[in-house]
Amino acid sequence: MISLPSGTRIWLVAGVTDMRKSFNGLGEQVQHVLNDNPFSGHLFIFRGRRGDTVKILWADADGLCLFTKRLEEGQFIWPAVRDGKVSITRSQLAMLLDKLDWRQPKTSRLNVLTML
């Protein structure tokens, strides 16, 4: 996983994104659709129409970075909102990339120990 500075926000870009877009196209979408700055250091996560691919755009001290993950089967869990952006935590990002439902994580039930 990438080490992110404190204060870095992680944004899911709602809706469907054309996965043919790269640095310029995704950066333009961040600027004009989300009214945000792609060089802010925040992560912007886009999902394609089929739901099996996400792209993460972020800027570090040296320039723009683009990470792509495509699932061999299944889809990434995505918010139901159609436009705008949704903020998630680092833990939710890890769950998203592991194809887990990050929206309502469930804890495993702890075994109750009894003293005899």
Set out the residue ranges of the language-model regions:
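Polybasic/polar functional segments that serve as interface/processing modules
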Residues: M1-L116
